[in-house]
């Protein structure tokens, strides 16, 4: 995961100090790209321990098309708690847009199911794109999409993914985002009969919050350890049938976690 540490170091050293929506203050750079060969190990940050249960359950929650945190709370995942209202609702966030995008004529579009069918039917398409950035729905969202758009690419029997992330909290958020979209790529590859290719992560505003600087410095002192391996239950042939128990990370040997406050 040297790619991630290079980003962290660059923003720490060269980032421009800017105010932000949360009032915390950031150092940021604009435009950064990382590439991970998914056949060479699962891109899970090892220089601090990540909460795997949160990463996996959040992705499964997105794929369920849900926008209420009840499912997450049931599985002891609290990463969305600060943004939910008293009933646990977040408005039309990722799950709604992925699975139930409101079409102009009123019918709902299941982008993920369409993507599955299109990869099988037309793998060379340049339109294998999913968007969570629904301009009409943004005012109703508790938090507008940070990871806004992603595209798939099939070549030589391998499935690759590129994510565009408009806003990237590089200490807390980006390690989760890398793992989440790498996991999604593996899952999609399995159910479409493909091998995995690359995960390409393109960042817009890549920022380090002012109250994460000390933690980032600690992390940069640590030498990355070998990447773990993702094992998916080979019996699963439908993307929507995956459960938490079907997803296993083997050989994850991280350094201790580094706590940092979330900017809300």
UniProtKB/Swiss-Prot annotation:
It holds the Pfam family Thymidylat_synt. It is found in: Cytoplasm. GO terms for cellular component: cytosol. GO terms for molecular function: thymidylate synthase activity. The active site is at 146 (nucleophile). Pathway: Pyrimidine metabolism; dTTP biosynthesis. It catalyses: dUMP + (6R)-5,10-methylene-5,6,7,8-tetrahydrofolate = 7,8-dihydrofolate + dTMP. Homodimer. This is Thymidylate synthase.
């Amino acid at each position: 995961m040297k790619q991630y540490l290079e980003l962290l170091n660059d923003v720490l050293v060269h980032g421009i100090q800017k105010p932000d929506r949360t009032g915390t203050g950031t150092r940021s750079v604009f435009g950064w790209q990382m590439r991970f060969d998914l056949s060479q190990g699962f891109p899970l940050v090892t220089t601090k321990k990540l909460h795997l249960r949160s990463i996996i359950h959040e992705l499964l929650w997105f794929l369920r098309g849900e926008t209420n945190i009840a499912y997450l709370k049931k599985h002891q995942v609290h990463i969305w708690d600060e943004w939910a209202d008293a009933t646990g609702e977040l408005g039309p966030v990722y799950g709604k847009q992925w699975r139930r995008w409101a079409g102009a004529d009123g019918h709902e579009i299941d982008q993920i199911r369409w993507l599955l069918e299109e990869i099988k039917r037309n793998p060379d398409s340049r339109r294998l794109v999913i968007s969570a950035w629904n301009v009409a729905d943004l005012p109703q969202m508790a938090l507008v999409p940070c990871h806004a758009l992603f595209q798939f690419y099939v070549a030589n029997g391998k499935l690759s993914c590129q994510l565009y992330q408009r806003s990237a909290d590089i200490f807390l958020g980006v390690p989760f985002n890398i793992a989440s979209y790498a996991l999604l790529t593996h899952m999609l590859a399995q159910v479409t009969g493909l091998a995995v290719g690359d995960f390409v992560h393109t960042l817009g505003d890549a920022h380090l919050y002012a109250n994460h600087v000390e933690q980032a410095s600690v992390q940069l002192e640590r030498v990355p350890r070998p990447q773990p391996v993702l094992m998916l239950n080979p019996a699963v042939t439908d993307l929507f049938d995956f459960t938490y128990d079907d997803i296993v990370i083997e050989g994850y040997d991280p350094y201790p976690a580094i706590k940092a406050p979330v900017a809300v």
